[in-house]
Amino acid sequence: MGAPASEREISFPCGEETLAGLLSMPKGAKAIVVFAHGSGSNHRSARNAEVARMLFDAGFASMRADLLTPDEAELNERTGQFQFDVATLAERVLAASTFVGTLEEAQLLPLAYFGASTGAAAVLTAAVKRRDVYAVVSRGGRPDLAIKILPEVKAATLFIVGGEDVPIIPLTEESYAALTCEKELAVVPDATHLFEEPGALEMVGRLTIDWLTRFLPKGQG
């Protein structure tokens, strides 16, 4: 399916840098979800685009934000410099969140995060610094990269992991045990790390929508 009609390219500042993103805003949105992509990906990620489309259809706005500039992304591809730089990635998530708060159509909406791969560590770190984040979802994430701060996370947190993502499952379980907030660990049967199997991303979308709806602040939706 194509992109929602109200999807538009945006740019937002972070310190001296300017980053790119895509904003999808359904009419009467219930909340806005800031997406953080894994290293080697960007706001055009097909997998996150599919989840964002499902969120749009369910009444959730989204901002799929690049966490690296084009030059940084190129450098990272060659050297891996930013791949596990969770502090920098979290700073970019916070910048995207601040930008969303300046948009007239989004500034009053509850805020949630969705992180994939290393982006999961970034959104969890950002959620500790922004107490107004009401929910966090990790898809095939690396929350273990932020394990020291996980006990401080207050937002309701959902970890989604593929049942065949063998290297990631124990890391996810260890991270899950460190959380003290409202939490859930969902396993998508037969799915590998990228959730490329038939029906896997659809299940990710359903789980995400259910979680965001369940913890939506009262008076919304």
Q: What is each model feature region?
A:
Residues 132-143:
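A conserved short beta-strand
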Residues 105-117:
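Alpha/beta-hydrolase fold nucleophile elbow
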Residues 153, 159-161:
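Short beta-strand/loop motif that positions the catalytic acidic residue
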Residues 179-194:
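Catalytic histidine neighborhood in serine/cysteine hydrolases
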Residues 199-221:
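Catalytic active-site module of serine/aspartate enzymes centered on a nucleophile-bearing elbow/loop
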Residues 166-171:
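Conserved alpha/beta-hydrolase "acid-adjacent" motif
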